[in-house]
Design a protein with these regions (language model features):
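EAL-family c-di-GMP phosphodiesterase catalytic domain
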Residues: 1-3, 22-36, 49-154
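Helix C-cap/alpha-to-beta connector motif
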Residues: 7, 11-22, 49
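Structural preference for long, well-ordered alpha-helical segments in enzyme cores
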Residues: 8-13, 42-43, 98, 118-120
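Short, flexible, glycine/charge-rich loop motifs used to bind or transfer phosphoryl groups or to couple energy/partner
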Residues: 13-16, 41, 65-67
């Protein structure tokens, strides 16, 4: 994370008159390993300004439960590799534990890589907050999303 990242982002948001709590900054676990004091300071500044912080791909790579305790995280995104295991006993144990833990820490839980109705139903049954994946839509460009949104909200 660059030295003045937080200050520059806040400045841009103010210049464009964007409501800060409508902005979600998505980070990966990898960024939390490097220069943790500097990263913590930047994330706290952004969070205090009203920007939401989302931790992407949780459970892969450099996961540490201490990140959830230390950093101001609003959204916890469960990696697709866990969602793919909703059919297995151990897979369900991991997903349910992540959902419960995140919610107890006042985080919204997002399941990534949802591809079928069985996954949606299971995630609903364990009170997962949000879902994303091909079941709902393939990745879209800004223009395609605008068209998609107009059709869905007629």
């Amino acid at each position: 994370m660059k030295k003045d990242f937080a200050e520059n982002l806040i400045k841009k948001i103010e210049e464009k008159s964007i409501i800060p709590n409508k902005v979600i900054l998505e980070i990966t676990e990898y960024i939390l390993i490097d220069n943790s004091n500097k990263v913590y300071s930047s994330l706290k500044k952004l969070h205090d300004f009203g920007i939401k912080i989302s931790l992407d791909d949780f459970g892969t790579g450099y996961s540490s439960l201490s990140y959830l305790r230390k950093y101001p995280i609003d959204y916890l995104k469960i990696d697709k590799s866990f969602v793919d295991e909703t059919y297995s006993k151990n897979g369900k144990i991991f997903i349910e534990t992540i959902v419960k833990m995140g919610q107890m820490l006042n985080m919204k839980i997002v399941a990534e890589g949802v591809e079928n109705s069985n996954q949606v139903e299971y995630l609903k049954s364990i009170s997962c907050d949000l879902y994303q994946g091909y079941y709902f839509s393939k990745p879209l460009s800004a223009k395609d999303f605008e068209d998609f949104y107009k059709v869905k909200n007629r």
